[in-house]
Amino acid sequence: MRLRSLKSSSGAVLLASCSLLLTVPACTTLPRQMPQVPQYAHDIDASQTSLSQIVTPLREQNPGLTGYHVLYDPLEALAARLRLIDKAEKSLDLQYYIWDNDRIGALALHALIRAADRGVKVRLLIDDNNAKNMEGIYLALSQHKNIEIKLFNPYRFRKYRAMDMVLDLKRINRRMHNKSFIADHQIALIGGRNMSNQYYNVSETYQFSDVDVMLVGSAVDDIVHSFDDYWNDDYAYPVKEIVSAQRHHLR
């Protein structure tokens, strides 16, 4: 009698589990985005900035060419980023796969806040795959009038992300590994470094060996256009539409 009861109970659990799997996928679909006007880098005129005054004559003297400087040293790569943030006067467009809440991540975010405070328009596009521990910070930063943050291909289940992996693997496996950094449409920095201690010789455990390239010239135009394509992609969601302010105790 006990065995039959156990079998019946197990069957009920299995049936309930199957029912859950059949009904939940409808809930995994990302919410429909609010209608948005596409944004493009050159909507902001950066032709009179200090960086433009330096770069424009070089481009006029070398039409169609690209100048570059390879950043092998991690501290030089960090200094280049911070210096570009400080020099930007109109816009900063940043795209990263990983941005951690560590010393490097915090240092760069504080620099971006200072830039936004002086009127620079900041667009930050982050892949959502590693954003779980940062989403509350992103949501708070997005309250700034000059900071816009989007998450690329976000998880529908914010707390239990494994559910997306089980129920929507094909979509969730499409990740954005791009790393680009653009100041006033004039200077771009691309490469393998994310914004995390391990990429800048700051981690106390291990370091990644990566390289960046700083660019001026025609290649920058391609990087600007690529950023715009990702920013306006259907998979790029404003953090305000995905992350709950109530969950992170924000108004």
What are these regions (language model features)?
Residues Q48-S50, P57-A88, I98-R251:
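HKD-type phospholipase D/PLD-like phosphodiesterase module
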Residues Q33-A41:
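Short, low-complexity, disordered segments immediately C-terminal to signal peptides
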Residues L94-Y96:
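Short acidic, glycine-rich surface-loop motifs adjacent to enzyme active sites
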Residues T23-A26:
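C-terminal motif of bacterial Sec signal peptides marking the signal peptidase cleavage site
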Residues R2-L14:
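Bacterial N-terminal signal peptides that target proteins for export
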